[in-house]
Each structure stands twice: as structure tokens, then as C-alpha cells.
Amino acid sequence: MDNMSNIKNTTDLFLRKIQTVSIDGRGITGLSSGIEELDKITHGFQEGDLITVAGRPAIGKSSLALSMVKRIAIDHRMPVIYISPSMTGEKIVQRLLSIVCKIPLEHIVSGMLSVEEWENLERGSAALRDSPIYIFDTPGISIDKLEEQVHMFCKQNKAKAVFIDYLQLIQSKGNPNWTRNDEVTEVVCRLKSLAMTLNVPFFILSQTNRPEHKEATDSIYTPKLSDLRDSGTIEDVSDMVMFIHRPEYYQVYQDEYGNDLRDITELYIEKNLTGHRNRIRLKSNYDIASFESVQTQNLSFDSGQASPFGIF
């Protein structure tokens, strides 16, 4: 009964929160992504929420996540935990340096840097070194160990966000007769519970099923919740589900209105408990993992719900 509270206290806390937001004028009640159009849709990522960022392999999930880590931990000095069974700490540092210094990742990995890039790297590495980012790169980490480590570090370091890259690599030591669906269901439910217990937004990166070739090469193809891999529970327990889609990845270079889709990343917000489903287009540079909002003509989202923010 430790979490039982009088509704009066919760109401008073919420009213004070939205009064502060109203004075601020940006309409953001949670953690900013650093992407203006995304913040308009999400109003910031809320404490205790489970946010699923889904897409095909090598589509840009880690790049988007690390760009948010840079915004939260380096620009705003808020502690972040980044859990990656798929990348070593060194690879994460390489990618963060690329983002911070605006130097192509290939230049950093190869060491083939211009004089100006070396100067930028020195400044960027100093900023990264002093940032409150905590990396766990244990391969095959279990959900039990993850819960233990995250709970301890959140309490000790007041972490404001937790990123997990990616969900399908978190191990479950459940019933040996469980299917893969059962294992992922247990992991995602426990992550949602942990997010609520710690009152911190959790971002889980998730793989999706391979789309049919005809679907993927269709200029109006849109990712959908049923694309989530391994468990329908991901959709059920997530407070928000967003898909990353890159038409250019499937050799689609124009949409039906003639808009140029080269270097464009589309974010489809397919589930959003604090607002409508929506989509945005971002001008992206994956050499340095940068994402900027872009104005596009005739972009709409046939979601069955009207967009509260009109056409982007």
C-alpha cells in the first residue's frame, strides 16, 4: 500500500505542474526530445511512461535515441542511463562524439580528421566526459540484472531518462516452456513497472517484422502496430509507440505529392495516450545523427483521428 495517495495531493501536484508549464508557454509538461514538431505532439515525455521506438534494423533507432541522450544529458545536464546489449561502450562514445562534434562517424572511427575536426573533437570530448551519462553494455543482460542496476543507479544519480537499445536482447529467465512471445511479454511488463516505480520515462528500442516487399516500396506505405516483433504486449503496455521509417531506404525518393524524400526520416506516432496519433517528417543526416523538423506540403495522416496540429 506504499503507493496509495489521497487524490487531493495528486491533483494539487498536477495543477502546480501545469501552472508552471502555462507560464513557460511552450506546452511541454515532460522531457523534451529536442525536436520541435515531436514535442508539439508528445508535450514532452512523461515521468513513468514507457516509450517504444520501433523500426527495422539499421533504420536509425539508435541514432534518434542518442540524439535525445545528447539533448538531455549534455545540453541540459540531466542524468541518463543508456543500456545497450548490442553496442560496446566505446561504440556508443564514438556515436555520441559524432553527434556532439558534428563530425561524420566514419572520420572519428578511422582517425582521419582535419585540423578543424580535431579541435572540435577535443572540445566535444571534454563536454562528453563531464556529462551525466551512465552506460551499461553487458551482452545478454537479464531483466533481473537490469532491474537491479537501473533501480540502484536511478536512486543514486537521480536519472531523468532510461534508454534500452534494444528490447529483444534483454533476456528472461522465466519458465523453460515459454515461447519467445512469453519472454518478451515478461520483459516489457517489468520495464513498464520499473518506469512507474522510479517515476522516470523509459525508452525501449524495438525491432519490427520485415514488411512485404510490395508494401515497403509503396510510397504511401505506413508502419503499423502489428509490425512490432515478438509480442503484442509491447503495444498494450507502452504509453507511446513511434515508428521510424525512411522511404529512401526502400528506394522511394518521392511521395505521391512530389515531395523529395531523400534524407527524410518519418516518425509515425501510432499510439499516444496523451494526444492523437500523428506523423512528422525530419530532415536527417545520419553521418552525424542530426534530425530537424521540415515543412512538407500535403502531408496528412489517415489515422481515423484528426491531427491537433494540422498539416506539417
Give the ranges of each region predicted by the language model.
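C-terminal regions of RecA-like/P-loop NTPase motor modules
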Residues: 143-159, 176-178, 186-198, 210-312
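Cytosolic-facing regulatory segments adjacent to core modules
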Residues: 40, 71-158, 172, 280-282
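The conserved Walker
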Residues: 57
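Short hydrophobic/aromatic beta-strand immediately N-terminal to the Walker A/P-loop
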Residues: 51-52, 81
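Core recognition of P-loop NTPase motor domains used across DNA-transaction enzymes
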Residues: 1-47, 103, 117-118, 123-132, ...
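Conserved lysine of the Walker
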Residues: 61
